[in-house]
Amino acid sequence: MNHLSIITDSNICKFTLHDLPDRPGIAAEMFGRLGDAGISVVGLAAAGAQLGRTDVSITVNSADAAKTAAVLDTARRELDAQGLSQKKDVAAVSLIADSLSHDPGVAARMFRTLSAEGINIDMITAGNTAVTCLIDSRFVPAAQRALEREFTGQLASR
């Protein structure tokens, strides 16, 4: 059993490019522009392509929100995306471990715990060492308390 840590970050902003062409080079172009502007992407989720188009959502540090909006608005026009949206009042809640692949069901437990608290998950990113849920920032304290209760005994000492 892994020792888990719960990390929260309320200092982020979510952007989504809607109905972006699904073709080689689009991601390189989009993330190249962000990198050239000195913007670090914190999280990324892409929807499966439908009819050759897709949505791409990213999270960035709130301090980079205005710069990100400008870069992505230009990208929207030049890359033929049909829209750009921004969400400011979001937070990331993450479960971190050395290897989540050794603990089957951790993500499901996290999702069930948040659901039981009435907390909607806006975006999910996951890898071998972390599962991160983007939620409404108002619910961070409740999410943290609920996850601490659910994972008692698995949490790394602070």
What are the residue ranges of the model-derived segments?
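A conserved regulatory-domain signal marking ACT and ACT-like small-molecule sensing domains
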Residues: 1-158
